[in-house]
Amino acid sequence: MADRRSGNIYAKIPAAKKKEMFRTLAQNKNLRIERIVSFGQATPENTWLKERRDEWVIVLKGAAELRFQKTRRRVILKEGDYVLIPANTPHRVEWTHPRRKTIWLAIHSA
């Protein structure tokens, strides 16, 4: 793993921001581990996200809802809930908790 070998997942998180915060905690050619902090954000209307790699996400604090385009499946994630999003799967974040920050841990793998 590159550079950041230790730390605290909850460190350096401001009370609120207008934009989501993305911080890569560790990475190599096959793996990226990322902390995402949402402050009530959602994916813009009519926008679908599609990652080149598999993405496993867990909500550590807060809550969110994901929606998948092809299956129309919706998944509400509360603290401790996780989901695997296969590579090239169109999905979107419908909402994140409006009054509490939502802290995600995302693992992107080849």
How does the language model describe each region?
Residues M1-W48:
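A short, N-terminal "cap"/entry segment at the start of jelly-roll beta-barrel domains
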Residues T71-A87:
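Short acidic-glycine-tyrosine-enriched beta hairpin
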Residues F39-A42, A64, T89:
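Short beta->alpha connector loops
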